[in-house]
């Protein structure tokens, strides 16, 4: 019987027979550097051929081809690279390689809604493109588009690459990835083509990336490039509350995530002199904020609006606050679309530890508690207690256990330590810092006149692993480029509210983070918590910090120090590690987290230079979540261990299988990688710990985060914390958390001096997802990986150093309010961060 010839429809409307030879040739042409032993071209062509339908368009065929390759990625990670190349070639067919023509399409865009000219790039960028078109064409290198894996490319396609209207509601991507990088470089540096080329080359080769808002908006008519905004509640009045809400709505429609403190809002039942009535308190008000966050998104389906609400635990509405995100209870007492953080004074932790009482206060009758920290706070709080100003007195542990219960069920509230954040801040001369941002890595001063802002970028650490060693010199060079770029963004940024511009130009903070720390360890064959990995962790962050300080000092020599430099710790020769040492001496804390510098860099002469000429930026280092941009560059997220070695990641752009490429390469080298091994790893939820045929060294190297002691993660956070002048987004991971485990972790983090004790608590579902690819009988035969025991997770945390805080029963909740935790979290393209991450 003759095989029916299938016809496909070309882009010009003509039809032609489907030709497997053409498809095969196209794949073969993209196989450079791909392992042809594991990537079976013939099988791929066969499967695609079976999926071809009569009349299918060639664009749909391109999509089928790329998706078919992508879903084979669990067989070998090179399938992901091949799929990315197939998708990129499809994009290149419909876009121009001419930089000038590409910018012309964006500049001449006409809105389908208004039929008016609606350019997607700025007039400045269009003028530069016309003036320097030949030079820009020489700078750009389209071959680098073929370095993206499919997951990374689809993330770009979904949200980052600029689109134009094609009628009937259709939006078409007209920007190539390389053109996006060039747009960003031009948006930051304008006509300084030397800096444009430098930035473009480093970004397009994956050494660093600017944060998502910068990639979205640089070079556009409204270049809002900032990731994070911190807002102060203006005042405790209807005018103050709604003015602040309006301010947040304006920021949210075009910007990143927002952190806001509510410490000064009077509690429920508090007297209102103007009406002779009583206040409804925080909870009803926060439901209004919740609805605003839902309503005011950031346009075009790119990102949801998101607010993180911070509250100190002495506030009389704290119990209702802790219930707002829970899954059960009265709807009028819930606001689940907001995020919640605690701004915790040391005194509260001391009262919990000593089984003491805790007095809840109303800021209307016990004012100024949020305006002070340290001993000044303790003195004022205890004075109010003696004066009987409290609303009610409870056992401190009663509140503590409600905090833990909320974290087990929802993953929040975040835990930030007010005294550490303030004492170790280079902005402490400005006043008391009252909150962090949506992702807990930004710690900046706010007031009714100042909205704190931060511009972010992340450095891709795997790019600095060369020939089995880490290249600190190259890391320093790239960090200085990033610092100069972020400083430039401050001046070229579009600010949604005037208070943000005022603050950012005065203090000029930036936030430099990292991605791919776990990848760098894997490339160097270092298990995550190995002593050499811990040493590398310290050296990486010391190098980043000294490079950033040095670059900021060089900028100050040229342009002058930031306006409020005088009186800052840096102006007195105190950098971040000096503040850590000073804090520990003042508090009489042990010195177990103090380490000498790595010896590579000359800190003494740099500090002398800082005192002499100043710094251009008040703050520099802030390791943030990097969910979106690490997806783009193909790295593990930020500072975290691998969450799983095989999993499916769900984002706005689709569901994608992800496999640990480093593990696969090791298993190939050992001749252990095959379908049977792949199925075993899937059956064990991405763990290799229970697979005895894998050598112990490899099993240790590829432990997933659930198998790593959280004490080690906290120790490493404290080690690098000496070189982090803002804070860090530190997630903690417990498969089945108990109150005892959580208490142990929180107190250990606090005593180690961390500013952010916990971003999200990640836990695992009570039952494994059904694995449809496995025979149930085969699953029974598989050994299970070792679960974290209490001792394994925490070691000697708190042992012999403090009185054990009382145990409560294990809370039997999955982390329903936090992202899916059977692997990395479900995201909308930005993980738990949603808006703020790099």
Curated annotation (Swiss-Prot):
Q: Would the keyword ATP-binding be found if you checked this record's keyword annotation?
A: yes
For binding GDP, which residues are annotated in this chain's numbering? 227, 437, 441, 626-629
Which GO BP terms, alphabetically?
deoxyribonucleotide biosynthetic process; DNA replication
Site label Important for electron transfer, positions? 759-760
Cite the position(s) of the site with description Important for hydrogen atom transfer: 228, 454
Indicate the annotated site residue(s) for Interacts with thioredoxin/glutaredoxin.
Answer: 833, 836
EC main class here is oxidoreductase
Question: What is this enzyme's EC?
Answer: 1.17.4.1
According to UniProt, the name of this protein is Ribonucleoside-diphosphate reductase large subunit
